[in-house]
């Protein structure tokens, strides 16, 4: 399968996501520059962390107008899986692909630490390998992760079971003392109603190798890779080279789909150093 990693001016976790997809999980991965109008056959799109366009106006407010986001929206509308991590989550909110908004953290401080997450829903392409109620230990690094939604919208989100991850204590109990940013209903991760678009503030790509202090983030990547590995053929009569887009369209209705592999194309940001330390202020 092929991961498409979006890169905006100011992204600094794209290298981390690429490393997880390609080096840790052995999948094809492709950088998608923000000016591109082509997802290049990606089976899954990741919007990584960072400071897209310097976070001017609001986090993600300018990135939503990038040409690549037009393609991402169309891809998501066809059922293609999209994962927004940290700043990527903020971009999904600004783009209207997920409901709600992000505010400054409670206390107005940047939080960089490991948090515990309780898995709430496992019927998404990004949580299917986890167990309901499982507690994951994954790092965060943000200044604007305080999720907000009006009461009516929040009730609809809860009714539709769109909350997939909540901040919790190490035993999985909800306790405001373990909510690092004041997020409404302790929301750490959210999906759309179709369940193919997911946003989360914690960084699973930073928790895929023991060297980095933990591997609980593998549950997120194991889920999407496992979803695509569960079937390895495009629909009857469809050339394999055309399988990626068709399989993405079918994902929401038929989770057992696999994407076509391919060679890595040169990064549009070649020459940039990897940012393994992650986001520094938001």
Report the location of each language-model feature.
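Pocket-forming structural segment of enzyme catalytic cores
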Residues: 97-184
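N-terminal beta1-alpha1 cap of cysteine-dependent amidohydrolase-like domains
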Residues: 1-85, 93-99, 105-110, 118, ...
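Intrinsic disorder
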Residues: 236, 267-270
């Amino acid at each position: 399968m092929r991961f498409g990693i979006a890169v905006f001016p100011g992204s600094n976790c794209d290298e981390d996501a690429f490393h997880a997809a390609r080096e840790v999980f052995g999948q094809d991965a492709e950088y998608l520059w923000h000016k591109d109008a082509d997802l290049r056959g990606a089976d899954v799109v990741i919007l990584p962390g960072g400071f897209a366009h310097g976070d001017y106006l609001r986090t993600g407010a300018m990135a939503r107008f990038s040409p690549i986001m037009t393609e991402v929206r169309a891809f998501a509308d066809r059922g293609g899986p999209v994962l927004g991590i940290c700043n990527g989550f903020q971009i999904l909110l600004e783009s209207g692909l997920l409901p709600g908004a992000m505010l400054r953290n409670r206390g107005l401080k940047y939080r960089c630490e490991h948090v515990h997450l309780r898995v709430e829903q496992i019927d998404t392409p990004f949580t299917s390998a986890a167990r309901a109620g499982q507690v994951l230990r994954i790092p965060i690094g943000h200044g604007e992760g305080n999720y907000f939604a009006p009461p009516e919208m929040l009730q609809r989100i809860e009714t539709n079971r769109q909350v997939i991850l909540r901040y919790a204590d190490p035993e999985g109990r909800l306790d405001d003392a373990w909510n690092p940013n004041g997020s409404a209903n302790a929301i750490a991760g959210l999906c759309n109603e179709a369940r193919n678009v997911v946003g989360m503030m914690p960084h699973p790509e930073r928790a895929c190798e023991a060297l980095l202090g933990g591997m609980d983030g593998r549950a997120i990547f194991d889920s999407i890779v496992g979803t695509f590995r569960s079937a390895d053929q495009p629909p009857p009569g469809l050339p394999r080279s055309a399988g990626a887009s068709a399989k993405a369209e079918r994902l929401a209705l038929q989770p057992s789909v696999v994407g076509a592999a391919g060679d890595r194309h040169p990064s549009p940001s070649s020459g940039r150093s990897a940012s393994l330390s992650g986001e520094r202020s938001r």
